[in-house]
């Protein structure tokens, strides 16, 4: 079968890889001159299934009001009055109760756990290297309340069979030795030993090369104008004067998926702007070993080989990609506070990207009302964490195989009134 994949970020390239491995003839189309040059370029570097959780959570509406008056707030909102922004925010607010939070987090963890298993298999079969580490993730708490709140997430982890360690402040240095110097600022941490890290862009670009060697065609520098449809099917992709045709089409344009599907399918994917710094390591024993997640500022600090990646924050500002100095100052403040000897911060590279976020936090992966159009988008801040599992899942569906995990509640159909999954959507499917 001929399949066109729209988008060459980590989600698009992993989709292409698994489709190619399933025997399909795959073409990837992207407006950029290469793969992983937008949202996948400089993310936080975490592969953290256990921390997969929606931004829509109990208490977030009140926190958002408080954050409006804080200099180093993790979330910023700039209302532009557009219907798409207002509708998306309203849908997000409706997901901020405990029932929705647990339901959404459950399916996110299910897909993320499966994705890590898929990445492990891919790594073993290809030998791909991307400055990856398997040292786990450590979520740091600065208040007693944060430490107590961790018990809510632990319940989901236990249900999913995810190993964890709840540590007090005196135990943090056993996992991350450099934290011994700042333990007095912290109340404890939640460690997930099975989490991983790695350079998402490096992985994506190397996997794209492997895709090419396996026969995948990449059409870079090719902006897409629209999808052409007739009779409940897509019959082509219009790129300037050219129409590229295939048997099936995969939408993996990230935040731009919503506009590209306008008139065909209404999906609630909205850009969530994030920032990162990439810092050369200064003192090895003053830098992190793996990944730190600062719960207060929602900022991740990840160790690559000779670099530290500091990423986080969320701005609901539409498609604005301006680099704001106050955001850089927040990233610098957090890394200086936790790892004062870790890196040459003055040499850091500053970056911003648009994460494609759904109001319930779960990506939109699967079928659409058009029988040959599929979506793989809306992964938010977890594209790197969920990419391999999403790609394998989509390849299985397109190939007519039954996926290894429950999938009905991952497609756009879940936003339709009266939707109910056709089979139990349990967490343990990730380990089947």
From Swiss-Prot:
Supply the name of the protein.
D-amino acid dehydrogenase
Q: Name one GO cellular component term.
A: cytoplasm
**Among its keywords, does the record have Transmembrane helix?**
no
Its recorded reaction(s) are: a D-alpha-amino acid + A + H2O = a 2-oxocarboxylate + AH2 + NH4(+)
What top-level branch of life does the organism fall under? Bacteria
Binding, FAD: 3-17
Q: Which organism is it from?
A: Enterobacter sp. (strain 638)
Q: Name one GO molecular function term.
A: D-amino-acid dehydrogenase activity
InterPro entries under this entry? DadA, FAD-dep_OxRdtase, FAD/NAD-bd_sf
């Amino acid at each position: 079968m001929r399949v066109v994949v729209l988008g060459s970020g980590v989600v698009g390239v992993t989709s292409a890889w698994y489709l190619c491995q399933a025997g399909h003839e795959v073409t990837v189309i992207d407006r950029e001159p290469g793969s992983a040059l937008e949202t996948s370029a400089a993310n936080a570097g975490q592969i953290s299934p256990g921390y997969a959780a929606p931004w829509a959570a109990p208490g977030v509406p009140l926190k958002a009001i408080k954050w409006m008056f804080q200099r180093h707030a993790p979330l910023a909102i700039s209302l532009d009055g557009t219907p798409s922004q207002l509708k998306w925010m309203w849908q997000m607010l409706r997901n901020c109760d405990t029932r929705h939070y647990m339901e959404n987090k459950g399916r996110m963890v299910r897909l993320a756990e499966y994705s890590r298993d898929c990445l492990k298999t891919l790594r073993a079969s290809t030998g791909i290297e991307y400055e990856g580490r398997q040292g786990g993730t450590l979520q740091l708490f600065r208040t007693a309340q944060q430490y107590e709140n961790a018990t809510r997430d632990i319940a989901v982890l236990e249900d999913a069979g995810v190993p964890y360690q709840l540590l007090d402040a005196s135990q943090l240095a056993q996992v991350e030795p450099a934290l011994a110097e700042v333990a007095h600022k912290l109340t404890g941490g939640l460690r997930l030993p099975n989490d991983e890290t790695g350079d998402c862009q490096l992985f994506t670009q190397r996997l794209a090369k492997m895709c090419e060697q396996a026969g995948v065609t990449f059409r870079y520098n090719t902006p897409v104008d629209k999808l052409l449809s007739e009779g409940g099917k897509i019959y082509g992709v219009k790129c300037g004067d050219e129409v590229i045709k295939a048997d099936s089409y995969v939408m993996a344009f990230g935040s731009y998926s919503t506009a590209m599907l306008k008139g065909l399918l209404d999906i609630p994917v909205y850009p969530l702007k994030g920032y990162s710094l990439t810092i050369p390591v200064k003192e090895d024993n003053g830098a992190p070993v793996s990944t730190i997640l600062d719960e207060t500022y929602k900022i991740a600090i990840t160790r690559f080989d000779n670099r530290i990646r500091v990423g986080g924050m969320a701005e609901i500002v539409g498609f604005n990609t301006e680099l704001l100095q106050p955001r850089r100052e927040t990233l610098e403040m957090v890394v200086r506070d936790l790892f004062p000897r870790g890196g040459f911060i003055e040499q850091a590279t500053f970056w911003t990207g648009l994460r494609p976020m759904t109001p319930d936090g779960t990506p939109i992966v699967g079928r659409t009302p058009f029988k040959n159009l599929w979506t793989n988008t809306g992964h938010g801040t977890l594209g790197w964490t969920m990419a391999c599992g999403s790609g394998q899942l989509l390849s299985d569906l397109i190939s007519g195989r039954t996926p290894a995990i429950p999938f009905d509640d991952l497609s756009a159909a879940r936003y339709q009134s009266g939707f109910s999954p056709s089979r139990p959507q349990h967490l343990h499917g990730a380990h089947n």
